[in-house]
């Protein structure tokens, strides 16, 4: 009898875990992901989707070191591709969207274009850390494309991820930020500042990829949630935040 109880408890533990999907999401999904989760839970009220937001590069390092995530949404598809090569992935890497860069400010007239960054009024420019944040790499590429990187390098303030970079700009810790369109379109950002799109020819595509992470136990909830996010039903939500869906 005691053995039967133990077996039942173990089974219940497995069932409970199967109802929870742990998601590592790129920081540019800060406003999009909660809407995706809400729509999914409307169809699957018993599901639990546990989302962590952060830098795609740092998530890559964590997953490589055994972090317990079920799904990984990366703002740079190269990171999930590396995980697949290293044997951490179930199935294929899927491109779920392309992101865009904008110049954003609450105090500077960004309609003047990228060269406004050279103005004396601009003391600090926020970008995400290029070492591990995809939007930071693209921001650096953009500055170099327009040949102003050297002249503004001393003004750069680095955020750990693109959300922190946006916050630097909104809170006045930076005069201008090069951030994701997906963040600039959020109501709380739109109400406080203005932005202009940066020419996509000035930086490499922000191709974003997602994968299911291998685990000792198959998680059907994670598979269902990922399938839902990639469905046509979710395309309007992605487009609401400026993502280009392939």
Question: Where would I find each of the regions flagged by the language model?
Answer:
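Exported/periplasmic ABC-transporter solute-binding proteins
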Residues: 19-43, 48, 57, 61-65, ...
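Sec-dependent N-terminal signal peptides
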Residues: 4-14
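Active-site acidic carboxylates
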Residues: 94
């Amino acid at each position: 009898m005691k053995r039967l109880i133990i077996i039942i408890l173990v089974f219940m533990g497995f069932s409970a875990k199967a109802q929870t999907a742990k998601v590592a999401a790129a920081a540019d999904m800060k406003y999009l992901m909660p809407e995706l989760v809400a729509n999914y839970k409307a169809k699957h009220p018993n599901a639990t989707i546990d989302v962590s937001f952060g830098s795609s590069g740092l998530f890559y390092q964590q997953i490589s070191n055994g972090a317990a995530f079920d799904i990984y949404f990366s703002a740079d598809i190269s990171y999930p591709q590396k995980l697949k090569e290293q044997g951490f992935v179930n199935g294929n890497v899927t491109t779920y969207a392309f992101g865009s860069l904008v110049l954003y400010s609450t105090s500077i007239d960004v309609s003047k274009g990228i060269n406004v960054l050279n103005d004396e009024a601009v003391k600090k420019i926020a970008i995400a850390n290029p070492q591990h944040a995809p939007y930071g790499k693209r921001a650096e590429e953009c500055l170099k494309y327009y040949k102003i990187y050297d002249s503004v390098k001393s003004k750069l303030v680095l955020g750990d991820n693109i959300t922190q970079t946006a916050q630097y700009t909104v809170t006045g810790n930076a005069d201008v930020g090069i951030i994701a369109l997906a963040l600039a379109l959020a109501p709380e950002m739109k109400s406080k500042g203005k932005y202009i799109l940066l020419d996509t020819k000035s930086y490499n595509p922000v191709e974003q990829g997602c994968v299911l992470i291998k685990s000792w136990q198959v998680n059907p909830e994670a598979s269902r949630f990922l399938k839902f996010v990639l469905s046509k039903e979710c395309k309007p939500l992605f487009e609401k935040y400026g993502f280009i869906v392939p």
